[in-house]
């Protein structure tokens, strides 16, 4: 007979050992991947709850399974909190990921084979914005806009010209590695000129939008997608927002029964908790510090002689361009990892190297800010990054920095 009351230590010590090692890695290292964060114990408690046992195909009040009264309450709370957080009329909290949220919108706004226009992956876009290896590039005719080769910024005149040339049905405004504010009014103007709908994928900066530290896309976008982790600091998942009743009905049907079956109600519970946390004044203060920490870090890296894409940042992330140095993005990532600093290799505009090697690294401040780190720590971390990248093959330097990183981390426990 299967016992439901045994602990993880009793049932699967191998998995527990891996979890404990990961806990140690997170506690004693500096997490600087821009898309990662530390969610709260409350979110994890909700996500690890008994709700994982419940199937609930459909939407609150209209399920295809019985026994959904309590998960209806949970999902309804998540929806209402999301609507309040972003000032929208309709929200779908069921997408399992940001990618599935995007897929739901594409299927709502376009037919297979029609044209979509998004930021080029190598210039800071996301796989789901039209990459040929992704469903977005397989199911749709994907065109892309790129960054200005001189400034490293978006050039809206160029985007307009591209849109007029390719005549997309959907324009995607969003990124995975762009350190500047997006001008949604200009994107909307371009979309209107070519008769396209506008999707804003705010997965990276949703937490900043929620707190007024980034302009809101709500007045301009037909659809808005986001992940619920990253700067929102919730569980890993996705969400779609809109102010159109008609579009809400379409997007809901594209998520279920279109591309998903049963929603993950335990994850939706975690989303609801995270949205509730984000509605509190403390979260607004946190988001402001995410941005200010990124600016300090950028200034320090510039002072240390590093080249940054666009020369700085307006948001939570920094893109370091190493193309003028001998070191590759891959070596930089590995060397920093050996020193207890986790970043990710990233392509830069006009990339000459393979995406598996790259000429840049992407660095973010959301997780460090969650730990309570501020400007003083950013200055010290910038020094460590410089020391490691300037001595990438020197084990002595990396070991010394790693020990110093551990000491700093002890002062800022995660939980």
UniProtKB/Swiss-Prot annotation:
Database matches in PROSITE patterns: SHMT
Presence of keyword Cytoplasm: yes
Record-marked site positions (Plays an important role in substrate specificity): 229
SUPFAM superfamilies associated with the record: PLP-dependent transferases
N6-(pyridoxal phosphate)lysine: residues bearing it: 230
Gene3D superfamilies: Aspartate Aminotransferase, domain 1, Type I PLP-dependent aspartate aminotransferase-like (Major domain)
Subcellular compartments: Cytoplasm
Pathway field: One-carbon metabolism; tetrahydrofolate interconversion; Amino-acid biosynthesis; glycine biosynthesis; glycine from L-serine: step 1/1
Enzyme Commission number(s) from the entry: 2.1.2.1
GO molecular function, one term: pyridoxal phosphate binding
Record field: catalytic activity: (6R)-5,10-methylene-5,6,7,8-tetrahydrofolate + glycine + H2O = (6S)-5,6,7,8-tetrahydrofolate + L-serine
CDD domains (alphabetical): SHMT
Domain of life: Bacteria
GO cellular component: a single term: cytosol
GO BP: glycine biosynthetic process from serine; tetrahydrofolate interconversion
Positions of (6S)-5,6,7,8-tetrahydrofolate binding: 121, 125-127, 246, 354-356
Major location (coarse): cytoplasm
Xref: NCBIfam families: PRK00011.1
Subunit relationships: Homodimer.
Family stated for the protein in its record: Belongs to the SHMT family.
Stated name of the protein: Serine hydroxymethyltransferase
UniProt source species: Bdellovibrio bacteriovorus (strain ATCC 15356 / DSM 50701 / NCIMB 9529 / HD100)
């Amino acid at each position: 007979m299967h016992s439901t009351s045994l602990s993880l230590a009793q049932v699967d010590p191998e998995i527990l050992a891996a979890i404990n090692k990961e806990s140690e890695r997170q506690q004693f290292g500096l997490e600087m991947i821009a898309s990662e964060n530390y969610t709260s114990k409350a979110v994890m408690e909700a996500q690890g709850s008994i709700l994982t046992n419940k199937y609930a195909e459909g939407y609150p009040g209209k399920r295809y399974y019985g026994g959904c009264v309590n998960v209806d309450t949970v999902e309804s709370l998540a929806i209402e909190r999301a609507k309040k957080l972003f000032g929208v009329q309709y929200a779908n909290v069921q997408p399992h990921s940001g990618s599935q949220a995007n897929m739901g919108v594409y299927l709502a706004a376009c037919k297979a084979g029609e044209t979509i226009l998004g930021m080029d992956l190598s210039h800071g876009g996301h796989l789901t914005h039209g990459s040929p290896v992704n469903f977005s590039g397989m199911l749709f005719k994907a065109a892309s806009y790129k960054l200005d080769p001189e400034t490293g910024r978006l050039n809206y005149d160029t985007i307009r010209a591209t849109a007029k040339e390719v005549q997309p049905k959907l324009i995607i405004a969003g990124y995975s590695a762009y350190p500047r504010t997006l001008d949604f009014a200009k994107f909307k103007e371009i979309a209107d000129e070519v008769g396209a709908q506008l999707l804003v994928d705010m997965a990276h900066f949703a937490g900043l939008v929620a707190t007024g530290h980034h302009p809101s896309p709500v007045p301009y976008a037909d659809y808005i997608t986001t992940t619920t982790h990253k700067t929102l600091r919730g569980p890993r998942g996705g969400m779609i927002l809109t102010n159109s009743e008609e579009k809400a009905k379409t997007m809901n049907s594209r998520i279920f029964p279109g591309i998903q079956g049963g929603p993950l109600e335990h994850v939706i519970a975690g989303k609801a908790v995270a949205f509730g946390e984000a509605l509190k004044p403390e979260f607004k203060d946190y988001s402001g510090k995410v941005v200010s920490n990124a600016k300090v870090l950028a200034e320090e890296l510039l002072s240390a002689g590093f080249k940054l894409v666009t020369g700085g940042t307006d948001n939570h992330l920094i893109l370091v361009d190493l193309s003028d140095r001998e070191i590759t993005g891959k070596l930089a990532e590995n060397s920093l990892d050996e020193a207890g600093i986790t970043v990710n290799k990233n392509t830069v505009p006009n990339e000459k190297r393979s995406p598996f090697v790259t000429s840049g690294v992407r660095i973010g401040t959301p997780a460090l800010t969650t730990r309570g780190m501020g400007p003083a720590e950013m200055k010290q971390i910038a020094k460590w990054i410089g020391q490691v990248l300037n001595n990438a093959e020197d084990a002595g330097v990396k070991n010394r920095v790693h020990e110093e990183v551990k000491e700093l981390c002890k002062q800022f426990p995660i939980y």
